[in-house]
């Protein structure tokens, strides 16, 4: 059976699972009892007493730690959104793993570690330019994405109602749904940017946990790591790596939007994907934000139409350039107050694209990440739906590569990240929404090699003359100065000589003053 066939079979099997056993949270925790107790501390293995792998020294059930420091920004409500103090609206106690153990039951290892005791360093997973992949490697990547689109996520399901309605009208049926591995990836992004639900048709839009603040870089880094690990398990290939798309071409064309890669435009309808591409049949989820707001509900993973791109009429818009990368990487400050889309001389804000590449602001200009999403248009143009387009994966992999390069060049201290007064979700110790088990922004503020991966890439450095050039320039300047100094001495000598000559040549009288009189 083909990979796609297996994916469809697994997806259908997943549909038969009882609702009490399935969530954005682990299935095992989405029971009425666990939700009422607000505790997600499942046992590891068959022994029910081995809670969080405690009998093996892997972890223990503990109270969730959340960031209580003040935030800034446009979100001014309190206790109105289920993402505040994440994930305390759902669970107060979760597994807290020790050492390099990780996962909702401490059954996994932290990124970059392996072995029965998670004490062995894994070989680094190397992310490469998608254009440098061999035909076989390219097909493996595309096959993995396609398989993930149609394979039920083995561990997690999504919530379809906000926290107050999670147990349904009778309080006896968790409002949750199965989804595929790739659609789960999409749902995570949607949930991080969705509006606060205050009532029918009353959304509060001034909130975003993964954009417009410092967490932009760490949130999307963890998002990719999560997908990469899911694809490694799905394919049985621990060295599987997400490639990147170097979009800094300065051109007005998408060179990954081909049928050999992520799909060209359809001839009879350029807003759709070519039927020669596997992605032409991809349907999207989490696109109807206004409808969810009107009905006070969440995206439930239902397909809502075909994937779209729309570059028609955008020929004047050009992608970022290598010079933009060079300027961005020259910014020494990670972020600056107010840690929002109007921060100046901020590497994060320049990379995200609210600022210009040199760190200055121009309300008429989009750059980098924001510019590329706008350039692709269609499904990619709106944050809540953008992750549906597989270009999202390679786009954000390259964005993360730039972030990693900046981290390696400047090696910032942890306090370069604001501990407080960033927008909600963006303080250093805030648990990133909606990842579970909880993980803070600080835990991802590292170089990529500390998280088990690296990039095969050479990014441009600031143009500085080499030491031989500097030495030549300095030597030349010294020679010029010496010559000028000698010339000045010579001219001064001539001036003095000319000024005193008449006194030297005068014939003095032997008469005294009194005698002349």
From Swiss-Prot:
The chain crosses the membrane at residues 470-490. The keyword Membrane applies. Zn(2+) A binds at residues 189, 211, 220. GO terms for molecular function: dopachrome isomerase activity; metal ion binding; oxidoreductase activity. GO terms for cellular component: cytosol; melanosome; melanosome membrane. It catalyses: L-dopachrome = 5,6-dihydroxyindole-2-carboxylate. Its main location: membrane. It comes from the Eukaryota. Residues 491-517 are cytoplasmic. Residues 24-469 are lumenal, melanosome. It is a single-pass type I membrane protein. Glycosylated. Binds 2 Zn(2+) ions per subunit. Zn(2+) B binds at residues 369, 373, 396. Its cofactor is Zn(2+). Residues 1-23 form the signal peptide. It is found in: Melanosome membrane; Melanosome. Pfam families: Tyrosinase. Glycans are attached at residues 170, 178, 237, 300, 342, 377. One of its GO terms (biological process) is developmental pigmentation. PANTHER family: L-DOPACHROME TAUTOMERASE, TYROSINASE FAMILY MEMBER. Belongs to the tyrosinase family. Forms an OPN3-dependent complex with TYR in response to blue light in melanocytes. This is L-dopachrome tautomerase.
